[in-house]
């Protein structure tokens, strides 16, 4: 069932821009509901505390409504990667034919000593450019090497050109959180409806 929306006069609602995707394999069981035109409500339970926090931040700062249910029966690696796959599929499905979307979005986001850039093109052509380093292998039970794998999975399953760059930073927690928030704000911009755009935002006739 869709999350009940709160009133939001500053954000145009578009009926039907939501999707539910389930991925069940011998390694993971992931279920995600994604609503593009939301209010930032999130119900997340992957079994990985820090990852849950990042997904809630993604929902809050992108104003998406998100439900995520996962498991860590095998390991955190598979759960994080498969969550990225399912979230990307849900984003793609929720956007439907992509008519009148802005298509491009970007964000330059600071968090204390950290500055992160994210740029998105919902072109249908998946590609990830990721530039970030972490001074620790883990934040809680979250392996920092999985940040890139998560965004790779999203970019390829959603069909988006995704660039994420750490401009500078020291604290791994701050860098990762800034990446998730910058991604959220860039995706919010790219998925918004612009009534000046008639049909698809491309000269090719297809995205």
Feature map (PLM): residue ranges:
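Intrinsic-disorder-associated, low-complexity terminal segments enriched in Asp/Asn/His/Tyr and depleted
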Residues: 8-10
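N-terminal intrinsically disordered, cationic/polar leader segments
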Residues: 14-207
């Amino acid at each position: 069932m869709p999350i009940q929306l709160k009133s939001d006069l500053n954000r145009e609602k578009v009926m039907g821009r939501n999707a539910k995707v389930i991925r069940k394999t011998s390694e993971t069981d992931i279920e995600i509901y994604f609503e593009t035109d939301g209010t930032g409500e999130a119900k997340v339970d992957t079994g990985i505390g820090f990852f849950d926090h990042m997904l809630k931040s993604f929902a809050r700062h992108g104003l998406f409504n998100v439900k995520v249910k996962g498991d860590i029966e095998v390991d955190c690696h598979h759960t994080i990667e498969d969550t990225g796959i399912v979230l990307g599929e849900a984003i793609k499905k929720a956007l439907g034919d992509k008519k009148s979307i802005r298509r491009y979005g970007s964000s330059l986001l600071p968090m204390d000593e950290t500055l992160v850039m994210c740029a998105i093109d919902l072109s249908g052509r998946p590609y990830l450019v990721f530039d970030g380093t972490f001074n620790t292998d883990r934040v809680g039970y979250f392996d920092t090497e999985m940040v890139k794998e998560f965004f790779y999975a999203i970019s390829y399953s959603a069909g988006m050109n995704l660039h994420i760059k750490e401009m500078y930073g020291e604290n791994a927690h701050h860098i990762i959180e800034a990446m998730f928030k910058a991604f959220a704000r860039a995706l919010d911009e790219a998925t918004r409806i612009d009534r000046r755009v008639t049909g698809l935002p491309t000269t090719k006739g297809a995205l």
